[in-house]
């Protein structure tokens, strides 16, 4: 989706399952819903779909509204790539320090 040189995309809902950031339906959403949303973004001409990366949850008041379900960025993008053809897939945030470089 481009308008005068601008490219438009979206960050996937569902992926974080964080109650403070999510719509009420998202906590019941499945991986299949991620695929459905990504395919819809592709079909409607979005240039990209992004996912974010957090595998460590802060120990604060904000965390009380978060779940521990955060899909792995690389695995999520790989899975979505197998179900799409033209939409660009990107990591909005990817924290390399969360992962051991040799594992």
Residue ranges and their predicted role:
Residues 1-83:
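N-terminal beta1-alpha1-beta2 module of alpha/beta enzyme domains
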Residues 84-92:
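Conserved catalytic cysteine-centered active-site region
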Residues 96-99:
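Short, small-residue-enriched loops and turns at beta-alpha junctions
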Residues 101-103:
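Catalytic cores of alpha/beta
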């Amino acid at each position: 989706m481009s308008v005068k040189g601008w490219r438009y995309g979206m960050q996937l809902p569902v992926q974080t399952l964080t109650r403070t950031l999510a719509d009420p339906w998202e906590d019941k959403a499945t991986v299949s819903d991620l695929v459905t949303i990504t395919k819809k973004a592709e079909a409607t001409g979005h240039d990209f779909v992004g996912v974010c990366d957090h595998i460590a949850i802060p120990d604060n008041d904000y965390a009380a509204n978060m779940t521990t379900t955060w899909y792995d960025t690389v695995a999520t993008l790989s899975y979505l790539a197998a179900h799409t053809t033209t939409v660009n897939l990107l990591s909005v945030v990817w924290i390399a320090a969360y992962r051991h470089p040799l594992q």
